[in-house]
């Protein structure tokens, strides 16, 4: 079980590294890619929504698909990183199986373990970063390598 906690912590270090790489690329791009910005904003909002749920608070008022400026993305990336780093530093192995009850944006109640939620957050961002890379390729731009193994090298 200790290995599981270390793996989740490593996944979140990768998540932050990958977010920073995407953000830097979007900031340095000559042409604004509105779709890529929208997807990146969504990744960051979703991370915040899930953190709020993990804290036992209502997330229904939080945006999920609201596009924000790249300047705001910098702040959100840093805040999300701080929030999750603090949470992960305090989690014990037994905490991972604790069940969290929350409502989705439609008001439906769900119950998932902290382990399941943290795994979802890490994988959700990777999915959308892949979509961002697809948009970059379509615009004849170089995709950003955010593979986990690159992070570990």
Task: Put a short name on every predicted segment.
Residues 100-102:
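Short acidic-hydrophobic surface loop/beta-edge motif
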Residues 9-66, 105-153:
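Short, contiguous alpha-helical
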Residues 59-98:
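Helix-adjacent hinge/juxtasegments
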Residues 1-5:
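Basic/polar N-terminal segments that are highly enriched at the extreme N-terminus
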